[in-house]
Structure formats: C-alpha cells, structure tokens
C-alpha cells in the first residue's frame, strides 16, 4: 500500500499548495456511523490534528489531501492558512473542509481556526490554537434497505443531522525541537439522525514531537513521533525518522505498532516537493 504527496509553497507571505494521496482502511459496518479519517501524512497537514500547528509565521498555505480504499470508502480534505497581524502580534487564521464517505454514511465538516503566537525567546515561540467545527452527517436509508440492511432505529430515507464541535491545541516551535498537544471536539459530538438514532463522536487527544539533528545545508536527520487516543479508536501511534540531504532529498521509514512498517521519500525542486510513502 503506497502513498504519494506533492507540495508547492512559497516562503513569507505567498500562498502554497500541498497535496497528498493516501490509501486508508475504514470500517465496513454502517452502524460505525461517525468517525474521523486517519490521515497518515500528519507531517504534511499537522493542522488537521492540532489547530495551533498552522503554517509558519509569515507564510500562507493551501493544502489538499485525498484518500480512498474503494468507491465506498474515501475522503478529501482542504485546508488553508493565512498570516494575520493583530494587536501588535503576528498570528495565523485558517479554515478546513472535510468530506468523509463511509459506506452508507457521509460525514462533512467545516472548520474555522485561529492560532495566536507568543514569542518566548529568539528562535522559540508558543502557539495557542482554537477551532470551531460544524458537523453534518448523512445516512442513506433507502440504499440500506436495497442492500438488505435493517435497523429499527435508523431512518429508511436519506436523512441528515448537524452538530457543533470545539477543538483546542498548543504547539511549541524551537530552533530544533517541535512539540504539540491537542484535543479535537473537546465536548464530543452528538448527532441525531431521524427520530430515533443518535450517534456520538468522542473527543480525540493527540500529541506530536520532532527534533532536527544536523544542518539544512548538509545532512540532517529528523526523528518524529505521533500519537492519539479516543474511546472509539483507542491508542494509535507512529514513529518515523527522515534523513535529509541539503534539505532537498529525503529518505525515511515509519512504524505503526501492531500495524505496518513503511518507507517514504521526498524530493524538493525549488518550491515544489514530491513525495511517496509505502
């Protein structure tokens, strides 16, 4: 199973474009009505997990991600970040659009987020992030009946429900060290579909840590770790290490305990970055 990514970006105040192609596994059961897609390329779109980890200061960015297992299980994710100077400080605002197809369910979200920067010392800063999300969940009850799926609580027509969510994050950036913690949908998400069915999406807690060893003009090694926990997904984690040459060519590996060992590579050509993960 492979993954490809491409990145295009400009430093300072220009806009960039990030995209990635990923293959993910989703549940086959229609009662698993509401879940979050697992974005394996978390280092490409860290803002998906942490609203404080937006684009670097002075940088704008547009990101697009798409993943698919088959025609019944897929997602796409669009993110955008823009720098903002407010009250004498430099901050970041952004938005996110997610559409997650899960067999007979469609989960769409629209989020607005902001990240306030607190300078600590030269080369170090702390970012505080907040995100508000509108969730929209749709169930195709008519198609479920055609496929022989019955549940007395589920509607027999195409129905939808809406709910709101709140997420918080904290991200530290140093000269070499980067670390962050976040909670997605702090109070959980309770969505009512039809007259008798209610689905719940519990909070998700996540953390990341990375460290830059070496020089940007020669060889560099970047070890990183990501982990998350929620009541429905339990513990998930990934450890990865990436070796960079002149900040242009990268080769690394990743390991997800109990799941898989992967390899990834990346090539930067000016402002364009191409990558592949398997």
Say what each PLM segment does.
Residues 1-11:
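N-terminal secretory signal peptides that target proteins for export/translocation
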Residues 29-33:
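Sec/Tat signal peptide C-region and signal peptidase I cleavage site
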């Amino acid at each position: 199973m492979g993954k490809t990514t491409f990145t295009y970006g400009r430093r300072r105040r220009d806009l960039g474009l990030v995209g990635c192609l990923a293959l993910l596994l989703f549940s086959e059961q229609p009662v698993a009505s509401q879940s979050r897609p697992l974005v394996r390329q978390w280092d490409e779109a860290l803002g998906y997990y942490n609203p404080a980890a937006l684009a670097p200061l002075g940088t704008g960015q547009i990101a697009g991600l798409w993943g698919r297992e088959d025609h019944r299980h897929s997602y796409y994710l669009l993110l955008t970040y823009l720098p903002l100077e407010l009250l004498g400080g430099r901050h970041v605002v952004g938005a996110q659009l997610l559409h997650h197809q899960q067999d007979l369910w469609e989960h769409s979200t629209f989020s607005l987020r902001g990240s306030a920067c607190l300078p600590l010392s030269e080369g170090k800063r702390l970012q505080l992030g907040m995100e508000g999300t509108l969730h929209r969940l749709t169930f195709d009850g008519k198609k479920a009946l055609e496929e022989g799926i019955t549940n007395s609580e589920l509607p027999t027509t195409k129905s939808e429900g809406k709910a709101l969510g709140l997420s918080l994050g904290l991200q530290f950036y140093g000269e070499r060290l980067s670390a962050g913690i976040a909670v997605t949908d702090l109070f959980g998400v309770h969505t009512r579909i039809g007259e008798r069915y209610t689905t719940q999406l519990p909070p998700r807690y996540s953390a990341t840590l990375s460290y830059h060893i070496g020089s940007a003009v020669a060889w560099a090694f970047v070890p990183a770790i990501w982990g998350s926990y929620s009541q429905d997904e339990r513990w998930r984690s990934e450890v990865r290490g990436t070796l960079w040459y002149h900040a242009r060519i990268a080769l690394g590996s990743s390991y997800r305990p109990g799941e898989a060992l992967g390899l990834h590579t990346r090539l930067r050509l000016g402002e364009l970055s191409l990558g592949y993960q398997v």
